[in-house]
Amino acid sequence: MGFIMEFKHKSVLLEETIDNLNIKPDGIYVDGTLGGAGHSYQIAKRLTGGGRLIGIDQDADAIAAATERLKEFEERVTIVRNNYCNMDKVLDELGIDKVDGILLDIGVSSYQLDTASRGFTYNVDTALDMRMDQRQEMTAKDLVNTYSEMELFRIIRDYGEDRFAKNIAKHIVAARKEKPIETTFELNEIIKASIPAKVRATGGHPSKRTYQAIRIELNRELDVLENSIDMMIDRLNPQGRLCIITFHSLEDRIVKARFRNNENPCTCPPDFPVCVCGKKSKGKVITRKPIVPGDEELNENQRSKSSKLRVFERI
């Protein structure tokens, strides 16, 4: 059960998220990215017998760790192995219509990064994997060995925002013609050879952006997020809140745009005196600017550095 201890890293923006969920002791809450249950533990602690918490995660290790962590609250907690994009179905199957709050903490967990065998990290030589759901067949190894040069270029450019995307894609395709790319260190060497030495000397780990791109593509992270926000807002009771923590600008832009669109969905031309499109606001954006970690959290937890919390409230 060693990984249960590993999963106990401090959750990012914990107090800010719990505060913004406005937890009612008898409310129903959903943690769509359960992880090691850092946020969920604090939600469950605040619920009474009438309250309920649904925890969803696609990672088997997370489910095991969270089940252990939330044991003392088991009468009010239901844990489901699934992707949060299927929240509609999960809630329907549990006979739940509306909920009082939903939380998402997007991206890869510290546990996944730190567990070498999961293949998310470029710091340890291991098989290229990066699946958040181990039931999925396709791995990072399959992706780097089968995607066309154009597809690799597109994902590294768009999801990794790497200015050397074209060169990295070219080098990956050339290398795999010799032999399949199997491990993280093999991929690291290919990426390193694609980036000028003087840039490598100053710009952090050369693999960081490419690994992010592969992970996002493999797990369809941005599609899942974009296609789930409206559904989650529809599931909220009046005054219910959706809190989403993101870790890079690609995700944050999606959350900001979807929240804004749900607050003001009107598609009428700006010069129309009255709205005729009939699209009604579903609520309001609570965070005009995202909430970011304070100095204390940044000192305690370096991984919180790029995190942003945005909050939407249903009317």
UniProtKB/Swiss-Prot annotation:
Please give the biological process terms from Gene Ontology that the record holds. rRNA base methylation
Where located? Answer: Cytoplasm
Tell me what reaction this enzyme catalyses. Answer: cytidine(1402) in 16S rRNA + S-adenosyl-L-methionine = N(4)-methylcytidine(1402) in 16S rRNA + S-adenosyl-L-homocysteine + H(+)
Give the superkingdom in one word: Bacteria
Q: What is its main location?
A: cytoplasm
Q: Which residues bind S-adenosyl-L-methionine?
A: 37-39, 57, 84, 105, 112
Q: Which GO terms describe its molecular function?
A: rRNA (cytosine-N4-)-methyltransferase activity
What the protein does comes down to: Specifically methylates the N4 position of cytidine in position 1402 (C1402) of 16S rRNA.
Record's protein name: Ribosomal RNA small subunit methyltransferase H
Organism annotation: Lachnospira eligens (strain ATCC 27750 / DSM 3376 / VPI C15-48 / C15-B4) (Eubacterium eligens)
Gene, per the UniProt record: rsmH
